């Protein structure tokens, strides 16, 4: 893989990892357009550049992450369902990675977002701060996150939908989704790297580093823009986008 390809994939990863649009789907589609095969080495590269996106959340929310034990209690509780299921079902989950499943889940997720927003009602009793999330609700948001182990679902999409259904306002649901990515993606990425370390070679380090840095920069940008967007608008545009992307997937990838 060349530097240009690693930059493009880093941009795609950074922009889509924390948006409810499935970064996996975008990476598969863009890789296809670039003529890159979905080899084990290529998948290992995608896993590695996710670390750059994780670092973006740590950088932006470093104050909350380093000064709030109550926040970490909620994150750990929310991580439990995904952590257990991810460890037990690792091989099954990896076997689900197919363009067809990604396409279907993109479309289904888009329809769910539109439906949730249709019934969503803003009220004075909504949870508007992460530290006000009851522990049992944090756990159930983690259950929703577990659904995202199906490729194309979108981890952020599943957790945001879970948050909205459990009474969080849009901004709080989005921020909790970002923060929950830290333990979740750190564990998943670390496990994947341990499983696929033999695919990382010295000659690939420049491309890996380039993709990592690019993903970090664009993830910072995406998170800031996304929080500004959901503070004023709803998630319907993302639902529509997912449906369109799902059909594009069916045309170009299958």
Curated annotation (Swiss-Prot):
One of its GO terms (molecular function) is undecaprenyl-diphosphatase activity. InterPro entries: UppP. Its main location: membrane. It is found in: Cell inner membrane. The chain crosses the membrane at residues 1-21, 41-61, 75-95, 96-116, 130-150, 174-194, 210-230, 234-254. Its EC number is 3.6.1.27. One of its GO terms (biological process) is peptidoglycan biosynthetic process. It holds the Pfam family BacA. It is an enzyme of class 3 (hydrolase). Keywords: Antibiotic resistance, Cell inner membrane, Cell membrane, Cell shape, Cell wall biogenesis/degradation, Hydrolase, Membrane, Peptidoglycan synthesis, Transmembrane, Transmembrane helix. It is a multi-pass membrane protein. One of its GO terms (cellular component) is plasma membrane. Signal peptide: none annotated. It comes from the Bacteria. It catalyses: di-trans,octa-cis-undecaprenyl diphosphate + H2O = di-trans,octa-cis-undecaprenyl phosphate + phosphate + H(+). Catalyzes the dephosphorylation of undecaprenyl diphosphate (UPP). Confers resistance to bacitracin. Bacitracin is thought to be involved in the inhibition of peptidoglycan synthesis by sequestering undecaprenyl diphosphate, thereby reducing the pool of lipid carrier available. Belongs to the UppP family. This is Undecaprenyl-diphosphatase. The gene is uppP.
